[in-house]
Swiss-Prot record:
Biological role: Major component of the virus occlusion bodies, which are large proteinaceous structures (polyhedra), that protect the virus from the outside environment for extended periods until they are ingested by insect larvae.
GO cellular component: viral occlusion body
Alphabetized UniProt keyword annotations: Viral occlusion body
Species per Swiss-Prot/TrEMBL record: Euxoa scandens cypovirus
Protein name: Polyhedrin
Length: 269
């Protein structure tokens, strides 16, 4: 006997069938590059590769962004307190086409540029906050698990526009998300997850109920290189010992110092 009750057995059987169908499909692999471009000049490049399918368990790997990457205007390397920095409206839609402008002098913004070979019609990108909780829009109960993302980012992530959270076709587009210093911890962490809906899944924008009908493709982020131009590195007080970072799982990754005249050429952005 299989040792499961009937419901568990049928659930496992359905899960195995989804995995089999997924692995035999043409888009069973993901290869995605995500570029984080800070407005202070810091650029980080993430390469994602993976084919692991998980149903019912949305695992994730979190990446830590040291707070010294974003010193304030006084050179302090801690998150500021209350002030104009966290007021809403710093992120503005530019025609609703996936392009967003950053407010002048906003050092905490990150630009997401999504590239790669992936079936975006069947794939979603999901964010996690510093504490590892799943970020959702306010109308999905997100107020309790916002975990440091700026309210103004809701226009990007929820269903008001072409959003990151439910985006169907992200390849080649860029999006902005910003930490809100009102909520962010002093050592912010943000997580990313790429997952794939089961073909025919219903209520894809519904949160919890949708997850019961999803075979999740988890593409664990693997750091390749974080590109930082030399001028920014000096200005932002990078020390040699700080040029090797680790993911939350302890995996080291390299930070390369790139002269400004080779910056675009070497980073490809």
């Amino acid at each position: 006997m299989h040792g499961l009750d009937d419901a568990q057995y049928l659930q496992q059987k359905a899960h195995n069938k989804r995995i089999s169908e997924f692995r035999s499909s043409s888009n069973s692999g993901i290869n995605v590059t995500v570029v984080l471009k800070y407005t202070n000049g810091v650029v980080q490049v993430y390469n994602w590769q993976g084919t692991e399918v998980i149903a019912g368990s949305l695992n994730r790997q979190l990446m830590k962004f040291p707070n010294y990457m974003n010193p304030d205007k006084h050179g302090r390397i801690e998150w500021p307190g209350e002030g104009v920095e966290h007021q809403h409206g710093l992120i503005r839609s530019n025609g609703g086409n996936g392009s967003y402008d950053i407010g002048a002098g906003d050092p905490y913004a990150m630009q997401f540029i999504v590239q790669g070979s992936v079936d975006w019609n069947a794939t979603r990108l999901r964010f996690f906050g510093p504490d590892g909780s799943r970020w959702m829009p306010d109308d999905q109960g997100g107020a309790s698990v916002r975990a440091g993302l700026l309210n103004a980012a809701e226009d990007i992530i929820n269903s008001k526009m072409q959003p990151l959270y439910f985006c169907d076709r992200m390849a080649g587009k860029s999006y902005y998300v910003r930490f809100d210093d009102k909520y962010a911890p002093r050592f912010p962490t943000i997580g990313f997850e790429v997952y794939r809906y089961r073909v025919g899944a219903t209520n894809e924008m519904g949160g919890e109920s949708a997850r019961t009908a999803v075979a999740s493709l988890i593409s664990f982020p693997t750091f390749s290189t974080a590109y930082v131009n030399e001028k920014v590195a000096v200005e932002n007080f990078f020390q040699p010992r700080e040029l090797v970072y680790q993911t939350a799982m302890g995996t080291p990754f390299e930070v390369r110092l790139v002269p400004m005249d080779r910056f675009v050429t070497e980073t490809g952005i």
